[in-house]
A protein has these predicted regions:
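N-terminal phosphate-binding or glycine-rich loops at protein starts, especially the Walker A/P-loop
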Residues: 1-52
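Solvent-exposed alpha-helices and their adjacent loops that cap or buttress functional pockets
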Residues: 1, 6, 29-31, 65-69, ...
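Short acidic, glycine/serine/threonine-rich loops at helix termini
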Residues: 17-20, 47-53, 86-87, 118-123, ...
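Short glycine-rich or small-residue beta-strand-to-loop segments that form or flank ligand, phosphate
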Residues: 4-14, 73-79, 105-111, 137
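Short, acidic/small-residue loops that bind anionic groups at enzyme active sites
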Residues: 36, 123-152, 156-161
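Glycine-rich oxoanion-binding loops at beta->alpha junctions
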Residues: 50-105, 114, 142, 151-162, ...
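Short, ordered loop/turn segments at secondary-structure junctions
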Residues: 10-12, 39-45, 79-80, 112-115, ...
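Short Gly/Thr/Asp-enriched flexible loops that form oxyanion-binding sites at enzyme active sites
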Residues: 19-24, 113-133
């Protein structure tokens, strides 16, 4: 990998969302990414050109380990749903203009079903335009509602929490 990467978080802040971000960051650095940008508040933040250089915030192996255990969404999240491509081409043009400005080689989005929809739409638009940026979705959802998956990261944590809570209620009754 020779270019820059941008990563965002979207949807609910599950236990897996920051672990996924730590894994994306570490892998990108290990594979030679020049810069790893983080979208503040997901795709909505990117549309507002609100992003940070993660290497300024994650500087040591300890920072990566702490990020894995940090609650909530480190970059901030959103629930903004991209319009269909033909309904609002200007939105897509704006996103791709920002990606070009940052020289993004790979766009990574961590989230649930709507986040994977965002990745699909951006990937489809890149194909239509012949744009070289690669788009990758990192699934995490407590709802376990992603097509073609059995269990998504985040779902196991939610199921365990519910099971433990029910067990404690039974013991207290």
């Amino acid at each position: 990998m020779k270019g820059n990467i941008i990563v965002g978080q979207s949807g609910g802040p599950t236990a897996a969302i920051n672990s996924s971000l730590a894994g994306v960051y570490r892998t990108a650095i290990d594979r030679g990414a020049k810069k790893v940008y983080g979208m503040r508040h997901g795709i909505q933040g990117l549309l507002n050109e609100d992003y940070i250089d993660l290497s300024e915030h994650i500087q040591t192996d300890l920072d990566v380990e702490l990020l894995k255990r940090t609650p909530a969404a480190y970059l901030g999240s959103c629930r903004y749903k991209l319009p269909e491509i033909l309904e609002d081409i200007a939105t897509y043009d704006k996103i791709f203009s920002i990606l070009d400005k940052l020289e993004i080689e790979c766009f990574i989005y961590i989230g649930g079903n709507d986040s994977m929809d965002t990745i699909k739409k951006l990937s489809d638009y890149a194909i239509l335009r012949g744009h070289p940026t690669k788009f990758l979705g990192v699934p995490k959802t407590i709802d376990n509602d992603l097509a073609l998956t059995d269990h998504t990261p985040g779902y196991g944590s939610a199921a365990k929490y519910i099971g433990t809570s029910v067990k404690e209620i039974i013991q207290d009754s």
